[in-house]
Amino acid sequence: MTSLRPPRPTRRAVARSALALTGLTALATTAACSRPVVADQAAARESRGPVTMWTSNNEQELAWGRAIAEAWNAEQPDEQVSLQEVPAGASTEEAITAAIVAGTTPDLLFAVSPAATTDWVRQGGLVNLSDFEDGAAYIEERVGEPASGYAHEDGDYYQVPWKSNPVMIMYNRELFEAAGIDPDDPGMETYASFLEGAQKIVDSGASRSAIWPAPTAEFFQSWFDFYPLQLAQTGGTRLIEDGTTTFDDPEGVAAGEFWAEIYARGLAPQETSTDNAMAVGTTAMQMAGPWAIASYQGTIDFGIMPVPTQDGRPAEEITTFADAKNAAIFTSSRHQRTAWDVLLFATAVEQDRTLLDLTGQMPMRTGLLDVHPQYFEENPAYRVFAEQASRVADVPTARGSIEIWQRFRDAYVASAILGKRGVSEEFSSVAHDIDDLLGAGS
């Protein structure tokens, strides 16, 4: 099926089958005995030489990667960077896990999914960046307080938080106006007022649907419907905190029941869109990050607002899903010192500006608006995302994270989207299952 969202630079479609998930788990189990980790990691950490860097396969990030490689290579003739895209696969997470098993990982990856890092570390696939003398300090200085959310369970860093796509609600201003909603001040901050506005959109005939999240069961889809609302409602409480699930508490259930009401009223379709639904006018809203601006700019007159909360938190208090992609070095790298230097180079202020110019995605850096004022002055549509980027949370660092998210997604689809079971009962049941899984993995 075709994704309802415009082509998204940070994610590929993921096969939902149980076989694929079982295969991923099997890869994680067998990888430790088949990866070609460099035997002398201490020597590799100080070694310099040519390195390979992988990025996502979308045009914007490949353009950024080429710019980084060319700039580096012009100054470092003996430590050249070769750029490749992540190999095709069901998902980036599965492709990298398979590469760890096969021994084909690059030195550097600029497409790290935080959901997969804990298992990759347990496989022995990622270099501990805190072992570099300036590693932890650099990460914490660059990212600030949110950096702690990307630390491994041992407190060390195996990834550098690189870029985020804070999830907000983009809407078609023309369709809002047609429905009698003020596009400059929609007044849809609460669950109740959002439902009221969504009902107006459909009842007025302004659009076939009010909002159209992907109703499919891939593990990551909850990051773009339920999870931003849980984070917003709780001030940033993640799906798992301190080794225990949180989503079956009153705030999580309220977020799930909000979406259940959306679907029960027919305000969001239960099928997948076959085109860019908001661009063609078959829906009025989408959950999206700054990556989507390029898809709508010049096509529709759009607005941006925070995700709703039960009682309407002020915009400046809303936390949403970061949708981050990060950078890491693999233990198969023979020249980890060069890889680290390239990583530092690629995440410097100058290269952050290149990232903004080429992708519109938000560098994970404190004071982003102050660091790049000219960019946001020249590109005001991105400013609201930059403001939101300082208030984000990501997926929890947990063993078996992808399986956990898949179990949650299956329960969410059955209850909130399809209405086969009540949200509260289904959330409680799957929370017990996931807690058992977390306990077994500890």
Model segments located where?
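Extracytoplasmic "Venus flytrap"/periplasmic binding protein-like
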Residues: 71, 75-142, 178-180, 284-285, ...
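A structural signal for short loop-to-beta-strand junctions that line the ligand-binding cleft
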Residues: 98, 106-107, 136-176, 315-319, ...
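Hinge/lid segment of periplasmic solute-binding proteins
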Residues: 112-166, 223, 305-306, 377, ...
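Extracytoplasmic/periplasmic solute-binding protein
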Residues: 153-162, 167, 177, 192-244, ...
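Glycine-centered hinge/linker elements that transmit conformational signals in sensory
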Residues: 196-200, 241-270
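Long, aromatic- and glycine/proline-rich binding clefts that accommodate carbohydrate-like moieties
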Residues: 357-410, 414
